[in-house]
Amino acid sequence: GVEAVSDRIVDFAKNLADGDMSKFEKLKGAIEKGFGMARKSLGGKLPDISQATYAATMKKLDAWKNGTGAKTGTEKTE
């Protein structure tokens, strides 16, 4: 569902960043671009579930950036 997919997207971004928050904007931009490409290929509008996934992903990315995000469901803990 929406939560699982958005968790995976954010976890992927976190793993790519490897703790380097200077990569945040580039990663967020790449995610936005990916959703934009999907939107374009679908005639300019994403299905409702994809719109919800985009919104959840952006919210989780912002929480990560601001240090206010809880761990995602798939995030590794040490």
Identify the residue ranges that each predicted region occupies.
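Type III/flagellar secretion export determinants
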Residues: 1-78
